[in-house]
Each structure stands twice: as C-alpha cells, then as structure tokens.
C-alpha cells in the first residue's frame, strides 16, 4: 500500500473516531487488515495521543462561522495538523494531501477552505 492509500486509511480512522471513539487501535487495525501498515498505526496512534493539542490548534484558528465544520473536513484537518506538528511530515506535503482528500471526500470547493485554514495555522506558527 502506498503512502497516499495509507493516509486515506488514517483519515477514515480519524473520521470513525469522531463518530465512535476508538478504544482498541490494534483490534481496529486487525479487523481492517491493516496490522502491517506501520504508517497507519503510527499516524492514528499519534492522533489519538495528541488529540487535545490538535483540536486546540484547529479550534483556535477558526472563526465563529468555521467552527461548524463537517466531520469530514474536521477529520482531514486533524490528519494534516497531526502530520505537521507531531510526525514531522513536511508542511507542503501534508497540506497538499489534505487538499486532495478534500477534493475526493468533500463538497466541490471545500478544498479551498482546507488550504486556507491549514495555511493560516502554519503562518501563525511560523512553520
């Protein structure tokens, strides 16, 4: 499985967690036949471990209208923030992948919002 496919699985797991909290990541990965995917395991584990910081970073960068993001968009943004701040994935790679996920899984122009929000977070932090 290539990195794009792995990242897509991580996005799906973050989305799943937003609906029903993941209690046992090993069990979930086994059920999905993802136990050999180290990047998926590392990424979702990092997200679950750092959720409060990731959520704070996102929420503090949203205006009142944007606080009502869909779970899909929020999951994409969580994925990218986790990668940039807790996994040392290059900013440009993470934002580009988030935009691509938004184009695939969200409404037509939502990718622009994803790009704008992530760009704002990165500029604010000087990353």
Language model segments and positions:
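N-terminal interaction/assembly modules
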Residues: 1-104, 108-111, 115-127
């Amino acid at each position: 499985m290539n990195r794009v496919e792995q990242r897509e699985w991580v996005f799906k797991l973050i989305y799943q967690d937003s609906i029903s909290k993941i209690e046992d990541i090993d069990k979930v990965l086994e059920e999905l036949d993802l136990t050999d995917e180290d990047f998926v395991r590392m990424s979702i584990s990092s997200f679950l471990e750092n959720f409060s910081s990731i959520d704070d970073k996102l929420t503090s960068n949203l205006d009142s209208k944007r606080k009502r993001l869909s779970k899909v968009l929020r999951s994409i943004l969580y994925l990218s923030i986790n990668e940039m701040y807790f996994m040392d994935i290059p900013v440009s790679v993470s934002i580009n992948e988030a935009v691509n996920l938004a184009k695939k899984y969200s409404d037509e122009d939502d990718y622009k919002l994803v790009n704008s929000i992530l760009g704002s977070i990165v500029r604010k932090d000087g990353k």
